[in-house]
């Protein structure tokens, strides 16, 4: 009689063993700039979370979402909390380059894969051992800077002025456009910086105009990119104005208003998927996301699509990791990292083909050039 409990207990144990390594929930931690200066990036990303499924490969997914308020210290705090308290298997975020750079320490120290939603190539620099655990979905600055320089050259631009954020995003873009401009035979004649929350850039713009460049590139992201644009318009600047893919969202158009007309920028193809030929590789995926997003939240944003691309990557990588380990373990996190590093999937922005030396994996298929015309994005063909 003493042993009557043993057989059902043994049966339960055997059933658990036969169920395989994937019996636990998969916890995905997300930290976004849902408030603060970068909120126009983080809000559509937060919205996109609501569109995602709660299971992958038959396993329950817990999306744990935090707001870092566009603050680097808060982003790192969130990352550490997600890892130590919520025991996440992977981190997605943050929305900006400075925040993502700050978070890397927590991801690397804990051996937790991280998918950044920010643009700078510094985040995944292959020469930095920290980046073994770090991936990202937005296009690298270098890829987009090359497209900007080619457009400038085609428009006859010989001299360029630059004004950008006084942080890692702005510094990264300045370095890349200098490289691309030199290749295109364009001389950078003036450089200025400003903070994301600066209410005015009058002094910087006056210095830029005094240098008489034929074009000016604004190295900014989100609605703060409108500040120099509006000042240039107020000063009646006649040259061409370029922006980065960091402003490709409806809030920028709303804030910049008519002062944005004529501005040129590179962006992911999903922003103007209707204007692409049916042969475009990402058109179908982009259309599916945009349709789903706009049905619930209104006008599309490239930034929400960056988060959706992170989901697409995970939807392919998680089934591979489940073959090797159980969620909630360091072995699963390592297997997930390995699977992400071997990604070859079509996203909303481009085709991700990753390897040990490239944790972004996007190429020319991930960029198009657009112009702002009457508060709309128009594809430059």
Regions from the PLM with identified roles:
Residues 3-14, 24-381:
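Extracytosolic ligand-binding ectodomains
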Residues 19-21:
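N-terminal signal peptide c-region/cleavage motif recognized by signal peptidases
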